[in-house]
Amino acid sequence: MAVKKNKNVPKQEDPLVQKDEISSIHARIKIFETPFATQVLNPKVSEFCANCLRGPAPGEKLLRCGGCNFSMYCSKECQATAWLVHKPECKRLKASFPNLPLTEVLFLSKVIDRIQFLEKNGDKLGIEAERKFSSLVDHKVDIRDDEEKMAHFEKIFEKMGAFRGEEMIEKGEFFDVFCKATINSHSIHTNAGNEVGMALDLGVSKYNHSCRPTCSMVFDGYRVCLRPLVPGVDAENTEEAFISYIDVGRSKYIRRRDLNSRWYFNCECTRCMDPEDDALTAIRCANPACDAPILTSETEEPMNIACEKCKTIVEEDTVKAAQEYMKTLPASFDPKCPAEIEALPGKLKELLAKAEQILHPSNVYVARLRTALFHVTGTLTMDNLSSMHTQIYNNYKMCFPKADRHVGFQLLHIVKALIEKDERDEAMPYAFDAMNIFEVCFGLDHPYYLQTLALWTYLEKKIPKSTEELVQLTNFSDNRPIDIVSLLKRANMLPPPPYAAGTPGVA
């Protein structure tokens, strides 16, 4: 039986974001603020404006459209601006009451309305300034060969016909819309990572995926700010600016599976082609006294592997069992019913206990199980909580760019654990790194940056603050968006709103 030599050569530690890099990064942002179509998720309609996709101002409530009694707006100005898009939709919603169409149906219907508007009136608003809708990649052949996707198309086609009635387009034409929108649309999130809507932006759709992205998408409602995560990258340049289509904090096997299931390509980015990415799926050495990771992956041919550090042989059966166990673990934990929610903590503990026996502590599955358990229960059984957070942080550094907000959030978990142990000097550099990351990700005027700046200042200046006061600064409750509008105004890039008249009242 062949024996694989396990090479475990650690990469040289990348420095975190330096202050002299930040101004360089800010100078090369790219802003998109004319989407082709947007839609708030149905469960979020009462929380976010149907026009700007922002939440209401503090102390304010959304105003409901008096025509359809469904769409809601943060102001009369937003409702008036949206009328050009909402007018044809409004009467359909009223006619379909009390049957509410799926979010996807409402979204694709808006895409159809936009296409028809452009055909009739031309592109007066610059919606197709970045590229034409007709130029979008559609993967029609792949979608036709995908039985599950085609079954979904038939379902959506039927529901769209019921919603649009006599205004429904021919099936082949709708298939073209369905394919282009499926491949090129993106989700809209708050800064806390909560999904609130979906959008098709022709400019954003130009950017390719990388599991080692060089830019992040930051949202201000439907507006997108593309911010470089590394110095030297210009967000305008699609040859060097890459975004992530998926959650990149996972193994190569899971990333490629998800990318292929929706976008129909096998990712060969620099990270997916890097053998060291297998550190994310490392297993334990057979020698209990050895802490070296044994590199493998879920899909690698099982074989005996020799530990590079202690030379112990990890048997093929052990390797295969670990690979199979990783494949059985859920990619995410999203319980749907009260019984599942109640059972989740126990299930997570059981899965984690087995994972820790066979998988290395640096394994991404272990990190995700620990993170899920921490979020569900607020506690972990490990004696040294800061050590656990440091392990997850080291794992995140293998998954995310050094200026990614996920890394910043994990740094704050370390800061919190150290503060609670009264190790404030040790917490201070982690707070500083988190502050620099949030400056890159969110900007100088965002609450996340300002809050972390205050935390670092208190620690660095040794200002007398209670543990409770410092810990409070590690918890983010403000979900305010990045103020991209102010950036546009400063750059004189904000266009006037389209002409709107004859809007119905708001309640």
UniProtKB/Swiss-Prot annotation:
Disruption phenotype: RNAi-mediated knockdown causes lifespan extension. Gene3D superfamilies: 6.10.140.2220, SET domain, Tetratricopeptide repeat domain. Its EC number is 2.1.1.357. Zn(2+) 2 binds at C65, C68, H86, C90. SUPFAM superfamilies: HIT/MYND zinc finger-like, SET domain. Expressed in pharyngeal and body wall muscles. It holds the Pfam family zf-MYND. Zn(2+) 1 binds at C49, C52, C74, C78. It comes from the Eukaryota. Keywords: Metal-binding, Transferase, Zinc, Zinc-finger. GO terms for cellular component: endoplasmic reticulum; nucleus; sarcomere; striated muscle dense body. A zinc finger (MYND-type) spans 49-90. GO terms for molecular function: histone H3K36 methyltransferase activity; zinc ion binding. Changing D247A: Decreased dimethylation of 'Lys-36' of histone H3. It is an enzyme of class 2 (transferase). Disulfide bonds: none annotated. Belongs to the class V-like SAM-binding methyltransferase superfamily. Histone-lysine methyltransferase family. Histone methyltransferase. Specifically methylates 'Lys-36' of histone H3, inducing di-methylation. Plays a role in modulating lifespan and oxidative stress resistance, in a manner dependent upon daf-16/Forkhead box protein O and the Insulin/IGF-1-like signaling (IIS) mediated pathway. Represses transcription of daf-16 isoform a, perhaps by methylating histone H3 at the daf-16 promoter, which in turn leads to recruitment of histone deacetylases and thus modulation of expression. This is Histone-lysine N-methyltransferase set-18.
